[in-house]
């Protein structure tokens, strides 16, 4: 459990030097946000499966609703916020050399 909600890993593969893939389902509680962050070794692809999210990528905010998606290249700053009164659920597909929780740089900690 995180301060913004929770996630669960649905699928994970890739070993050694090959590209990795991880699929997660994230639930973001009403009024909560993921931190502004970027990843060195992985790209992410988000699909909204429930609710409406505000997604900021490289300083550009936009609203995404159910079945809408966005691709986030490695190294790009991004953030997801739930400004509604209902949970937001997304499927996150990670691909890259590392799909680990440690591959994260948070803007607030700089």
Region roles according to the model:
Residues 1, 79-110:
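Double-stranded beta-helix
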Residues 26, 34-40, 47, 81-83:
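Short histidine-centered beta-strand/loop micro-motifs
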Residues 41-59:
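Glycine- and acidic-residue-biased ligand/ion/polar-headgroup-sensing regions
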Residues 58-77:
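Short acidic-glycine-tyrosine-enriched beta hairpin
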Residues 1-24, 30-36, 104-110:
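A short, N-terminal "cap"/entry segment at the start of jelly-roll beta-barrel domains
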């Amino acid at each position: 459990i995180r301060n913004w909600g929770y996630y669960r890993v649905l699928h994970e593969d890739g070993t050694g030097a090959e590209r990795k893939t991880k699929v997660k389902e994230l639930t973001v509680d009403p009024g909560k946000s993921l931190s502004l962050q970027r990843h060195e070794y992985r790209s992410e692809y988000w699909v909204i499966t429930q609710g409406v999210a505000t997604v900021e990528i490289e300083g550009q905010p936009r609203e995404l609703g159910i079945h809408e998606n966005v691709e986030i290249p490695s190294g790009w700053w991004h953030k997801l916020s739930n400004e509604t009164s209902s949970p937001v659920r997304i499927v996150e597909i990670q691909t890259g050399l590392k799909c680990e929780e440690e591959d994260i740089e948070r803007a607030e900690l700089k």
